[in-house]
Amino acid sequence: MNTRRDVFQAIADPSRRAILLLLATVPSMTAGAIAANFDSARPTISKHLQILTACKLLNQQTSGREVHYQINATHMKQVADFIEPFRALWEQRFNKLESVMKKYKSR
Amino acid sequence: MEMKTKVLANDGEQHLLISRVFDLPLELLFKAYAEPDLVSQWMGTVVKKMDNRVHGSFEFETTDPKGNKMQFHGTIHTWVPDRQIVRTFEFVGMPFGVQLEQLDFSALPDGRSSLRIQSVFQSVAQRDQQLKLPFAFGLSMAHNRLEQILQPK
């Protein structure tokens, strides 16, 4: 199985990106709490959670009858897309530094 | 396109490395960090205080597109012109803790220069949180764009 391609397929879907975004700001959430944030039917959200878990982007923890989900930061960091926005932010900032200083030099 | 800026963040470590080669002589690169007016221009921030010496400190205030004000501050521990800055850095009111930053500046043969930043966080979780922020922000931007597209006109 080509896991890498699967990961990109997983984050290509807007609902799944929204789930990841939701979980990026909290330690963990139950399937019910996640579903409550969306208009989609609960089984649809469950399917998305299954895919994200299968791609190792989410970790699952069962306590009693509730399943808790959390972002698998370890795996997410391996996805270039995860660290890329952080890198792009610095690239942008440093490009600006370069252009500001080139103007400064020619003054 | 070649990636000029590199970020290294190994799993389970509480620091990250940012490195970049600049098409600028070393003196100009360092000046970009030393002069408040220049820092303000490239960082897009208001420099409220910048006292570049050992025991000195800095204070930045940035306003985001929504008008929210964000404060950043820190204390300078080492200040060696054209070589090294060691300072603390804190994003006030955010859960990233205080970072210890070491900035190493060096000259490269062909009139270029390089900067290497090591940022040490107080925990692995705080480093990961910081790394996640632009990712989460990017996701929400994508989400907002999608909402705009789907919005009935």
Indicate residue ranges for each PLM-predicted region.
Chain B
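Hydrophobic ligand-binding cavity/cleft-lining segments
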Residues: 1-46
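Short, highly charged C-terminal tails/helix-capping segments
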Residues: 151-153
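Hydrophobic pocket/interface hotspot
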Residues: 29-33, 39, 58-60, 76, ...
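A short, structured loop/turn motif at beta-sheet edges
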Residues: 26, 77-83, 104-114
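Beta-strand/loop substructures that line and gate deep hydrophobic ligand-binding cavities in soluble
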Residues: 93-137
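Short beta-edge strand/loop motif at the mouth of beta-sheet-based domains
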Residues: 17-18, 36-71
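Intrinsic-disorder/low-complexity, polar/charged segments enriched in Ser/Thr/Lys/Arg/Asp/Glu/Gln
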Residues: 13-19, 57, 71, 84, ...
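Hydrophobic/aromatic beta-strand elements that line small-molecule binding cavities or substrate pockets
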Residues: 20, 48, 72-78, 89, ...
